[in-house]
């Protein structure tokens, strides 16, 4: 619809120029938006204002000239000039009816597009160290990353999902030491357990498992070798749990990429040597430093310590070089908000390598405040007591968890109330939206049982010309906006845009259903309304699918 209006405007502007009503045939880009207030029409454009400088005319005069020369269009009821020169368009009801045909035809592809033109995009998300179970913060990142990937794919991008396994470095060594010390305790040895080791019962459970498998054998090895064995075993056990928890949350990856493989393949050392040759890495105080300040970071960063051990930054450089070497047009990382300071140094590495940092995006996911009946849930990472992703899914279910994690922009902190997530009332957003889908499924079954529809008939063939109630036209307008909403969500990388849309559509349907019966004594009117609610059901399902939430037929 926006494209049709754009062509109407441009056609009118060209004819106005030909008639001498405009001074230039160069027309700058315009915006066409749905106004906030219904009184301002269905669409509004700033064409006259952005053309004022080129035309050297007052915007309202430009608007008058364009409107006077526009072709008549059967779906435009009237146009108005508002304020400094906005052109407002009021559409006839019949303008919205073709949306129903399109929804029936496209079905589960309605809302999809070629916006991404097949460009290759990698979305790397969660990527938690395999040193403990995924917690509530990881859960929000998982919901965001997976939804972003779904939306980009639906919008025509070729998307790859990846999990980066931090299976090398100090934290893995600390994990191994933590398990080894717990195992020693289980062997009856007196050991001191440092506070910087990993706490929590899961460490004791891994130690007990390892004790049962090879406790005697381990006890005969020197500590360094025993710690290394414990580290590998523990990381595998934890990673297996992470995989299972993510699958239960509806998240699956195309690739799990090991940090250790970067060292084994020599890619880390190769990256360091490449940057040395570019004079981007230099030596100072026995360490090797990356000139990140040259590329916009606040200071230079160490890549190899004076003891010869590489930093995490070194492997991160190699990893991001490897990503671009795989041919991705765009790389998106989903990080916790506490990694904000890391963005500039990765951008610096990308720019220094000769690649383009504008092809690299970081989504920073803010913290989750976990509540129960409005009261904070106590958590302590130091004591190892925290609410895991598995805990949340077990208590409230995948659908409620994902939907609530996506209910606000990831730029903002989120209050997640476990009790609200379990409610089967309109106070629970996921129930509010899913209930629309289930209710319409019930309406369609009733329509078949009452012979309003044939069982084999697609419920979209009704007479839509009978849809004239204000609530019906409002629903049609909301349905027509879904493709643009998906495109906006893809362009901004903000999945909460889909959440907000679904809540609005659900609210409009509930309002309509409370005022009007779908199945009435008038069979033709009933069939028209069935076409409408079937379209609502389809779009609710498509939107929920993008967020990784199911659309139940019964509730």
Swiss-Prot record:
It comes from the Bacteria. The keyword Aminoacyl-tRNA synthetase applies. SMART domains: Arg_tRNA_synt_N (SM01016), DALR_1 (SM00836). InterPro entries: aa-tRNA-synth_I_CS, Arg-tRNA-ligase, Arg-tRNA-synth_N, Arg-tRNA-synth_N_sf, ArgRS_core, DALR_anticod-bd, Rossmann-like_a/b/a_fold, tRNAsynth_Ia_anticodon-bd. It catalyses: tRNA(Arg) + L-arginine + ATP = L-arginyl-tRNA(Arg) + AMP + diphosphate. One of its GO terms (biological process) is arginyl-tRNA aminoacylation. The keyword Ribonucleoprotein does not apply. It is found in: Cytoplasm. Its EC number is 6.1.1.19. Its main location: cytoplasm. It holds the Pfam family tRNA-synt_1d. It is an enzyme of class 6 (ligase). Keywords: Aminoacyl-tRNA synthetase, ATP-binding, Cytoplasm, Ligase, Nucleotide-binding, Protein biosynthesis. One of its GO terms (molecular function) is arginine-tRNA ligase activity. A motif ('HIGH' region) lies at residues 128-138. Belongs to the class-I aminoacyl-tRNA synthetase family. Monomer. This is Arginine--tRNA ligase. It comes from Desulforapulum autotrophicum (strain ATCC 43914 / DSM 3382 / VKM B-1955 / HRM2) (Desulfobacterium autotrophicum). The gene is argS.
């Amino acid at each position: 619809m926006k494209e049709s209006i754009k062509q109407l405007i441009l056609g009118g502007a060209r004819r106005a120029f030909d008639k001498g009503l405009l001074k230039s045939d160069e027309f700058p880009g315009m915006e066409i938006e749905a106004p906030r207030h219904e009184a301002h029409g269905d669409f509004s454009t700033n064409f006259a204002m952005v053309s004022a400088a080129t035309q050297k005319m007052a915007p309202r005069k430009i608007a008058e000239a364009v409107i006077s020369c526009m072709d008549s269009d059967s779906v435009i009821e009237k146009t108005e000039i508002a304020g400094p020169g906005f052109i407002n368009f009021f559409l006839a009801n019949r303008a919205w009816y073709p949306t129903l045909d399109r929804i029936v035809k496209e079905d589960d592809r309605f809302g999809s597009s070629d916006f991404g033109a097949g460009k290759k995009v990698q979305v790397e998300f969660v990527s938690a160290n395999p040193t403990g179970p995924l917690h509530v913060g990881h859960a929000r990142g998982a919901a965001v990353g997976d939804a972003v990937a779904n939306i980009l794919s639906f919008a025509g991008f070729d998307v790859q999902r990846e999990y980066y396994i931090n299976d090398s470095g100090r934290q893995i060594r600390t994990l191994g030491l933590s398990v080894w010390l717990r195992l020693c305790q289980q062997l009856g040895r007196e050991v001191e357990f440092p506070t910087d080791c990993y706490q929590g019962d899961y460490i004791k459970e891994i130690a007990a498992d390892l004790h049962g498998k090879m406790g005697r054998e381990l006890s005969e090895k020197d500590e360094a070798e025993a710690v290394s064995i414990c580290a590998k075993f523990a990381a595998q056990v934890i990673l297996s749990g992470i995989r299972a928890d993510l699958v239960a949350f509806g998240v699956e990856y195309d690739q799990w990429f090991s940090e250790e493989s970067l060292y084994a393949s020599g890619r880390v050392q190769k990256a360091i040597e490449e940057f040395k040759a570019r004079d981007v890495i230099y030596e100072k105080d026995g360490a090797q430093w990356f000139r990140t300040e040259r590329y916009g970071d606040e200071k230079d960063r160490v890549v190899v310590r004076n003891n010869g051990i590489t930093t995490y930054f070194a492997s991160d450089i190699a990893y991001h070089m490897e990503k671009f070497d795989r041919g991705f047009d765009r790389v998106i990382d989903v990080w916790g908000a506490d990694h904000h300071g890391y963005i500039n140094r990765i951008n610096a590495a990308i720019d220094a390598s000769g690649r383009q940092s504008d092809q690299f995006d970081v989504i920073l996911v803010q913290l989750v405040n976990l509540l129960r009946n409005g009261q904070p849930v106590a958590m302590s990472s130091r004591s190892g007591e925290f609410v895991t992703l598995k805990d949340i899914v077990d208590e409230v279910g995948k659908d409620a968890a994902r939907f609530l994690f996506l209910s606000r922009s990831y730029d903002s902190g989120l209050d997640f109330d476990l009790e609200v997530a379990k409610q089967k009332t309109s106070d629970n957003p996921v129930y509010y939206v899913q209930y629309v889908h289930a209710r319409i499924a019930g309406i369609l079954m009733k329509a078949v049982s009452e012979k309003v529809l044939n069982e084999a008939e697609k419920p979209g063939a009704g007479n839509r010309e009978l849809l004239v109630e204000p609530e019906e036209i409002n629903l049609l307008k909301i349905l027509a906006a879904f493709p643009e909403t998906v495109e906006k969500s893809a362009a901004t990388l903000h999945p909460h845009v889909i959440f907000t849309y679904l809540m609005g559509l659900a609210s409009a349907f509930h309002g309509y259903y409370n005022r009007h019966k779908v199945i009435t004594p008038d069979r033709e009117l009933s069939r028209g309304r069935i076409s409408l609610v079937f379209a609502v059901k389809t779009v609710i399902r498509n939107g929920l699918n993008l967020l990784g939430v199911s659309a139940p037929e019964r509730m």
